[in-house]
Amino acid sequence: MAVKKILLLNGPNLNLLGTREPHIYGYDTLASIESSLTTYLSSLTPSVTLLSFQTNWEGALIDRIHEARTDGTDAIVINPGAFTHYSIALRDALTGVDIPFVEVHISNVHKREEFRHKSFLSDKAEAVICGLGVYGYRAAVEWCVGYLKEKPKA
């Protein structure tokens, strides 16, 4: 059986997790979240692996999404950070590669400033998870594993 790949993407300022506004985002660092997800995923199934990428640059995020089209990525979990609210280019990249994706936000963006209520990605995502803290990443990965098991062979 071929190993499936889930690509975890994190956008701007998420490299500051653990120290940036911990009253909103918590005290877990991005490295600890990635490590925890890798451990959790291996407990769920040996046939799915997690790849991680974080950048503060919109173009780099788009380039990585394009790369996913040819590197065997089967599903994407993305916390686009502030790109959520204005990046049509990110939306176009995600829809252009035809890889299912889950949008994740640590905080409940709907309880925050008005400008955070609009997402350019939500209507194209398979699922949107927000307000569950870092557990949202785990829920997204678990959803992807279920999706990949149920996905018909091409």
UniProtKB/Swiss-Prot annotation:
Q: In its UniProt record, which GO terms are filed under biological process?
A: 3,4-dihydroxybenzoate biosynthetic process; quinate catabolic process
Task: Provide the catalytic activity annotation.
Answer: 3-dehydroquinate = 3-dehydroshikimate + H2O
Question: What keywords is this UniProt entry annotated with?
Answer: Lyase, Quinate metabolism
The superkingdom of the source organism is Eukaryota
According to the UniProt entry, its GO molecular function terms are: 3-dehydroquinate dehydratase activity
Pathway annotation:
Aromatic compound metabolism; 3,4-dihydroxybenzoate biosynthesis; 3,4-dihydroxybenzoate from 3-dehydroquinate: step 1/2
What the protein does comes down to: Is involved in the catabolism of quinate. Allows the utilization of quinate as carbon source via the beta-ketoadipate pathway.
- Subunit annotation: Homododecamer. Adopts a ring-like structure, composed of an arrangement of two hexameric rings stacked on top of one another.
> Which family does the similarity line name?
Belongs to the type-II 3-dehydroquinase family.
Protein name in the entry: Catabolic 3-dehydroquinase
Which species is listed as the source?
Botryotinia fuckeliana (strain B05.10) (Noble rot fungus)
